[in-house]
C-alpha cells in the first residue's frame, strides 16, 4: 500500500472558512433589513415570513432577475459596492408596477474563487437595496465553484416576493383613451444595454475612468445604481388612481410599454418633453447608434412610465416630486387599432 496525500475541500478550490467569514461579515447589514413579518434569522434551511395582517385577500407576486453584463464592467473597474443595489432594483421595480409591496429577497452569488471583500461589498449593496425598497434580505446562496468561473469572476441573481391586495392589482386593464402618461427619471442606463455599452467602449477606445462627462468620470455615469422606485410608487398608488405602470428595462420603450396596454390603445410619447441625460447622448454619438435602436436598448432617462386619468395628473406629479422623483408628463394614451403600440414623436 502506497502513501497518498490526504486531500481536502480547500485543495479542490472550495474554502469553507472563507464562506463562514463572509457570513460573519454580512450579518450586521442583513439584520438591518428585517421586517416584522420575518421569523427566525440567518442560517436556517428556509426563511419563514408571515403575510402582513392588513391584507384581506393577499396575492403573492414573485420575480427574479440579474444585472446582465453591467457586472462585467463592474468587475473590470473593480467597483462592487453598488451592483447589489442594481440586483434588488431590477426585481422590486418589476413587482411594484403591479401594485405589490416587496416582502423578502434572496440572492445567489456564484464565483470561481471566493473573495470575502468583494462578496461582502456586493451583499452589502443588496442589503442597501432592500432597505431602500422596504423588504427583508432573508437568505441566499454563496457558491464557490472552481472551474466554472474564471478566477474571482462572479455572477449574481436575485429573487423577490411581494404582496398585493387582490382587488388592487395593477394590470393595465383600466387604461383607456385620454389617459396621461407620467415619466419617472432614471439614474442612468440602470442595468440594461450593457453589452452595447461595452461594445461602444471597445470600439471607441474610451477609458471610462479617465473620460469625463458632466464633471465626473464616465464610469460613474455607467455604474450609477439602478433607481429604486418602490416607496414613491406605493405612496402614489395609495392616493391616486393608477391605471398601469411600465418598468423600462430590456427592450426599452418599444417592448416594455406595450406589456401594460390593452388592445386598441396606443401610447404616444412626446420626445420634446425631456432631454436625454448626457450619458445617453455620449453613447449614441460614440457608437453611432440609431435613434430607434437607442429607444429599443436603453431607457434614455426614463425609468418608469405611469398611466393615469387626466384629472389625477397634477396630484400625482406633486406627490412624486415631493418624494424626490424627477417626474413629468411624457405623453398620452390614444384609441388605436394600429399594430404600432408606441409612437415617439
Swiss-Prot record:
InterPro entries: PurM-like_C_dom, PurM-like_C_sf, PurM-like_N, PurM-like_N_sf, PurM_cligase
One function term, GO molecular function aspect: phosphoribosylformylglycinamidine cyclo-ligase activity
Organism: Escherichia coli O81 (strain ED1a)
Family: Belongs to the AIR synthase family.
Reaction(s) catalysed (UniProt annotation): 2-formamido-N(1)-(5-O-phospho-beta-D-ribosyl)acetamidine + ATP = 5-amino-1-(5-phospho-beta-D-ribosyl)imidazole + ADP + phosphate + H(+)
GO biological process: 'de novo' IMP biosynthetic process; adenine biosynthetic process
Main location: cytoplasm
Pathway: Purine metabolism; IMP biosynthesis via de novo pathway; 5-amino-1-(5-phospho-D-ribosyl)imidazole from N(2)-formyl-N(1)-(5-phospho-D-ribosyl)glycinamide: step 2/2
Broad enzyme group: ligase
Keywords annotated in UniProt: ATP-binding, Cytoplasm, Ligase, Nucleotide-binding, Purine biosynthesis
Domain of life (superkingdom): Bacteria
Cellular localisation: Cytoplasm
Name recorded for this polypeptide: Phosphoribosylformylglycinamidine cyclo-ligase
Gene3D superfamilies, alphabetized: PurM-like C-terminal domain (3.90.650.10), PurM-like, N-terminal domain (3.30.1330.10)
A single Gene Ontology CC term: cytosol
The EC number(s) this enzyme carries: 6.3.3.1
